[in-house]
Curated annotation (Swiss-Prot):
Species of the source: Saccharomyces cerevisiae (strain ATCC 204508 / S288c) (Baker's yeast)
Source lineage: Eukaryota, Fungi, Dikarya, Ascomycota, Saccharomycotina
Gene from which the chain derives: RPS1B
Any single biological process term in GO: cytoplasmic translation
Biological function: Component of the ribosome, a large ribonucleoprotein complex responsible for the synthesis of proteins in the cell. The small ribosomal subunit (SSU) binds messenger RNAs (mRNAs) and translates the encoded message by selecting cognate aminoacyl-transfer RNA (tRNA) molecules. The large subunit (LSU) contains the ribosomal catalytic site termed the peptidyl transferase center (PTC), which catalyzes the formation of peptide bonds, thereby polymerizing the amino acids delivered by tRNAs into a polypeptide chain.
Official protein name in the record: Small ribosomal subunit protein eS1B
Crosslinked residue numbers (Glycyl lysine isopeptide (Lys-Gly) (interchain with G-Cter in ubiquitin)): K248
């Protein structure tokens, strides 16, 4: 019989239970605040590891991008097919101040608009806003039947598509260049630009389901705390000193 180590006796230490530590004890919660251009500013909560040593929690939070449904921000189910991206730019206590970072459509909404017997027209432009944000905006539109039309389809010719795409690009460029990022966001929510495109292209070919389907942020200017505070409705009031009345200097006779 070979003499050696008994493997069964050496298994005792492996069966010891390890101390279970709840990972959430090392984390803390922060409230996400949307800009004042939206009706509901309370987006939700996010967590991050607590500040320890040289690692600061605010450094891990800055630049974090969250995706929110526009229906939750506006309190209306009419905007349920839009997704808005918000970027954390500043940490104030337990509040995270965000800025607009982009917008997109849900996949089911896009697929529901694509149908037979019509032409899909897409256009995109890269423009800089008046406050130096570089955006790439994608627009989508579909043709519809003309009044008293007998034909089943409403296909547009290539010349019509080029003319419509040119008009859409011109309108998008003009609206973005003459607006700040906050003003542009307020125009995208009620779809003001869509109605302008529909009126401008009705002489070329009648359109329907015109939407700015996507907004992508390509470049942003240098971070300005004052502009972010104004966007969140904070720090807009000027702090002015008041004139003091009834004050007399006291002269001491002896020092």
């Amino acid at each position: 019989m070979a003499v050696g180590k008994n493997k069964r006796l050496s298994r005792g230490k492996k069966g010891l239970k390890k101390k279970v530590v709840d990972p959430f004890t090392r984390k803390e919660w922060f409230d996400i605040k949307a800009p004042s251009t939206f009706e509901n500013r309370n987006v939700g909560k996010t967590l991050v590891n607590k500040s320890t040593g040289l690692k600061n929690a605010s450094d891990a939070l800055k630049g974090r991008v969250v995706e929110v449904c526009l229906a939750d921000l506006q309190g209306s189910e009419d905007h349920s097919f839009r997704k808005v991206k918000l970027r954390v730019d500043e940490v104030q206590g337990k509040n995270l101040l965000t800025n607009f970072h982009g917008m997109d459509f849900t996949t089911d909404k896009l697929r529901s608009m694509v149908r037979k017997w019509q032409t899909l027209i897409e256009a995109n432009v890269t423009v800089k806003t008046s406050d130096d944000y570089v955006l790439r905006i994608f627009a989508i539109a579909f043709t519809r039947k003309q009044a008293n039309q007998v034909k089943r389809h409403s296909y547009a010719q290539s010349s019509h598509i080029r003319a419509i795409r040119k008009v859409i690009s011109e309108i998008l460029t003009r609206e973005v260049q003459n607006s700040t990022l906050a003003q542009l966001t307020s125009k995208l929510i009620p779809e003001v630009i869509n109605k302008e495109i529909e009126n401008a292209t009705k002489d070329i070919f009648p359109l329907q389901n015109i939407h700015v389907r996507k907004v992508k942020l390509l470049k942003q200017p240098k971070f300005d705390v004052g502009a972010l505070m104004a966007l969140h409705g904070e720090g807009s009031g000027e702090e002015k000193g008041k004139k003091v009345s009834g004050f007399k200097d006291e002269v001491l006779e002896t020092v």
